């Protein structure tokens, strides 16, 4: 009976390999549903309770960006000093949220507020505010662009 080497190679690859008499198990991918159930189980062990009345949450990052949770679920276990925030975060600039988050800003964000105030006093648009390095880069890029107000392009050259 002739044996086709291609079919034989395909069969050998498809069968589970044995190492030391036991089969090698294929790794299963971790799904987010499994992560969620593990998180829920862990919060249950800590006796975390749902905290009502939280409409939004903001996490301030070092680079001046804010993780903004519009609809947030909060569970807390004060005995274990553990709190879980669940929802879909949006990364926003601090200037996009400035009227709503002024009461939430602490001492660590005073430098960002100071930079914003300087930009407003200088007449710049605060929407352009990002990190301090980004503001300097846009100023340098705008220096090369000539003002063409009430002039023709051919006259400038």
Swiss-Prot record:
Belongs to the NAC-beta family. Residues 33-98 form the NAC-A/B domain. GO terms for biological process: protein transport. One of its GO terms (cellular component) is cytoplasm. This is Nascent polypeptide-associated complex subunit beta. Part of the nascent polypeptide-associated complex (NAC), consisting of EGD2 and EGD1. NAC associates with ribosomes via EGD1. It is found in: Cytoplasm; Nucleus. It comes from the Eukaryota. Keywords: Cytoplasm, Nucleus, Protein transport, Repressor, Transcription, Transcription regulation, Transport. Its main location: cytoplasm. Residues 130-139 have a biased composition (Low complexity). The keyword Transcription regulation applies. The keyword Nuclease does not apply. Residues 1-31, 125-157 are annotated as: Disordered. Component of the nascent polypeptide-associated complex (NAC), a dynamic component of the ribosomal exit tunnel, protecting the emerging polypeptides from interaction with other cytoplasmic proteins to ensure appropriate nascent protein targeting. The NAC complex also promotes mitochondrial protein import by enhancing productive ribosome interactions with the outer mitochondrial membrane and blocks the inappropriate interaction of ribosomes translating non-secretory nascent polypeptides with translocation sites in the membrane of the endoplasmic reticulum.
């Amino acid at each position: 009976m002739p044996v086709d080497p291609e079919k034989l190679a395909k069969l050998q690859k498809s069968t589970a390999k044995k190492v030391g008499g036991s089969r090698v198990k294929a790794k299963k991918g971790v799904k987010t549903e499994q992560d969620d159930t593990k998180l829920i189980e862990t919060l249950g062990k800590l006796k975390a309770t749902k905290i009502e009345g939280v409409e939004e949450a903001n996490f301030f990052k070092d680079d001046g960006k804010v993780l903004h949770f519009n609809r947030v679920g909060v569970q807390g276990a004060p005995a274990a000093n553990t709190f879980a925030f669940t929802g879909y975060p949006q990364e926003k600039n601090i200037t996009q949220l400035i009227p709503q988050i002024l009461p939430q800003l602490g001492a660590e964000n005073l430098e960002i507020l100071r930079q914003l105030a300087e930009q407003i006093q200088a007449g710049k648009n605060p929407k352009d505010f990002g990190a301090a390095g980004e503001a300097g880069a846009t100023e340098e890029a705008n220096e090369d662009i000539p003002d063409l107000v009430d002039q023709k392009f051919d006259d400038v050259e």
